[in-house]
């Protein structure tokens, strides 16, 4: 089950969307007073993925059959008319972007135990309902999942009583279908995503890149076509194209082909600089955060790649902004521009030499009145490393259910006495794995669970199924310590994270 991301036909307008609800849904969800109003449906608001999952559940549980094109139009109509405002979805962007290796926390003392033990709490908090409808959702869970009250964190309490008397009022107060944010967003000027942008990020195993992105309208309701033309910082080209749909006025969902690889893209277009994630639909851990800067005429400096330059070395520095001019750019003490590799309105690619005796610390970039501070630093050593995620889950795989990789990145920090740490971005490290504990060592988890790429921090799990070479013929699960050690330093600097390699997950909705 997954949200189908593609251009919608022109028939996906509001009136025709309402007609589709009447056709496929109103047999059970009765029309109510007011235009475009139905029982239960009008008591809820959700993300595009949330509405798509609802339609899928109607098919699985009630036999509702909605053809693909009509399903796409239904999702578009429901997300546009009953979606979430940007500030409502903002706390859960990580879940929408399928950044799954994270630990949730909530401002309710028992919500984790009551609701977020079978699915993420974010799946709940990306919905808005009336208090009456939240109560109906609780009752649905008890009826549909009949062992719910006998499970751990339920059998030790009056689960249903607590859910109805405590959780439902909290959800009704804090996640109501009525909100000022939604009312304001419905009155906001529609977002126009067309134009030219600079997009940048760091592709796992490939490296940092910058690319020009052209977005133009395509045939269909809020449908767009995009092209990507860029380079990795080591000079390799990056080319691609894709199709996208804009839901709820800002929720960008695209199918991309980058260098021949099929990827999905999720962006929030409500921001001045849209941002989000690009990832592999079959291996969602294999993804990258990206930011887009729209083209403009005024001078601005918004970002640099990389963020840390080592003293005594030459490197390619990407400066991203608008109205950039290499001749007018000041790069800071101890830095010398050796060659301008590329110059565009929104991008400078510079070969920069760093003096071997340059003082470690921040460097400000300046051009006329535009300044970028505390985003670029010079360092002579790395004082501290920080791996993210610090806890991750990878999954063994087979042809029918592909493996889920363990993808790690590391940031370096320069720490001066009495000063705030200076973030250096990604720095060169060597990656390795070792047993997390004595049991993992005795079971040979390092041997059987998979392989860590020393250079990239990408862990590739082993194949699924029983392994006759293991104790009890068990599968290739493991409990591993992931270590990153800074390269080229006289004193070892490292950090550790934990990686659980486990079995496949068979039910993978877009919102876990």
Residues of each region from the PLM?
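C-terminal capping alpha-helices of c-type cytochrome domains
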Residues: 63-95, 147-186, 190-192
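Edge beta-strand at a domain terminus
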Residues: 187, 268-302, 497-506
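The canonical Cys-X-X-Cys-His
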Residues: 22-32, 74, 111-123, 167
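Immunoglobulin-like IPT/TIG beta-sandwich domains and homologous Ig-like subdomains
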Residues: 311-314, 318-369, 425-428, 434, ...
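Short, aromatic- and glycine-rich surface loops/edge beta-strands on solvent-exposed regions
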Residues: 329, 358-369, 469-488
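Beta-strand/beta-sandwich contexts
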Residues: 293-328, 370-422
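Gly/Gly-Pro-rich "capping" loops immediately C-terminal to redox-active cysteine motifs
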Residues: 30-61, 120-145
């Amino acid at each position: 089950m997954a949200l189908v991301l593609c251009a919608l036909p022109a028939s996906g307008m509001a009136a025709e969307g309402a007609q589709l609800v009447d056709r496929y849904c109103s047999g059970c969800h009765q029309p109510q007073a007011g235009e475009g109003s139905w029982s239960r449906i009008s008591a809820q608001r959700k993300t595009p993925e949330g509405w798509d999952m609802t339609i899928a559940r109607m098919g699985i549980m009630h036999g509702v059959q909605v053809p693909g094109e009509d399903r796409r139009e239904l999702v578009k109509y429901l997300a546009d008319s009953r979606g979430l405002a940007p500030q409502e979805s903002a706390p859960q962007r990580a879940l929408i972007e399928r950044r799954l290796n994270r630990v949730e926390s909530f401002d309710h003392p028992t919500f984790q135990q009551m609701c977020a033990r079978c699915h993420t709490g974010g799946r709940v908090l990306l919905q808005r309902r009336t208090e009456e409808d939240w109560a109906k959702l609780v009752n649905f869970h008890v009826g549909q999942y009949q062992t719910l009250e006998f499970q751990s964190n339920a059998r030790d309490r009056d689960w249903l009583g607590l859910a109805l008397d405590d959780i439902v009022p909290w959800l009704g107060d804090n996640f109501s279908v009525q909100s000022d944010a939604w009312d304001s967003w419905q009155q906001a000027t529609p977002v126009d995503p067309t134009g030219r942008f600079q997009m940048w990020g760091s592709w796992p195993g490939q490296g940092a890149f910058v690319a020009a992105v052209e977005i133009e309208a395509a045939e269909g309701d809020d449908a767009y076509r995009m092209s990507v033309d860029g380079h990795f910082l080591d000079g390799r080209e990056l080319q691609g194209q894709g199709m996208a749909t804009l839901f709820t006025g800002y929720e960008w969902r695209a199918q991309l082909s980058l260098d021949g690889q099929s990827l999905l893209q999720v962006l929030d277009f409500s921001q001045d600089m849209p941002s989000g994630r690009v990832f592999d639909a079959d291996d969602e851990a294999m993804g990258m955060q990206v930011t887009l800067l729209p083209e403009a005429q005024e001078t601005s400096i918004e970002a640099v790649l990389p963020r840390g330059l080592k003293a005594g070395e030459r490197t390619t520095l990407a400066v991203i902004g608008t109205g950039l001019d290499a001749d007018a750019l000041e790069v800071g003490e101890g830095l010398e521009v050796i060659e301008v590799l590329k110059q565009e309105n929104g991008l400078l690619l510079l070969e920069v030499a760093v003096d071997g005796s340059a003082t470690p610390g921040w460097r400000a970039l300046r051009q006329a009145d535009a300044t970028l501070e505390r985003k670029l630093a010079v360092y002579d050593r790395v004082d501290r490393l920080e791996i993210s995620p610090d806890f991750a889950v990878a999954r063994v795989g087979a042809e029918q259910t592909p493996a889920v990789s363990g993808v790690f990145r590391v940031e370096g920090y320069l720490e001066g006495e009495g000063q705030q740490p200076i973030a250096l971005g990604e720095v060169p490290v060597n990656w390795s794995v070792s047993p997390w504990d004595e049991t993992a060592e005795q079971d040979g988890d390092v041997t059987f669970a998979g392989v860590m790429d020393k250079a990239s921090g990408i862990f590739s799990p082993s194949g699924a199924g029983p392994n006759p070479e293991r104790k009890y013929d068990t599968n290739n699960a493991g409990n591993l310590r992931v270590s990153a050690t800074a390269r080229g330093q006289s004193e070892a600097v490292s950090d550790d994270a934990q990686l659980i390699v486990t079995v496949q997950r068979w039910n993978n909705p877009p919102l876990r």
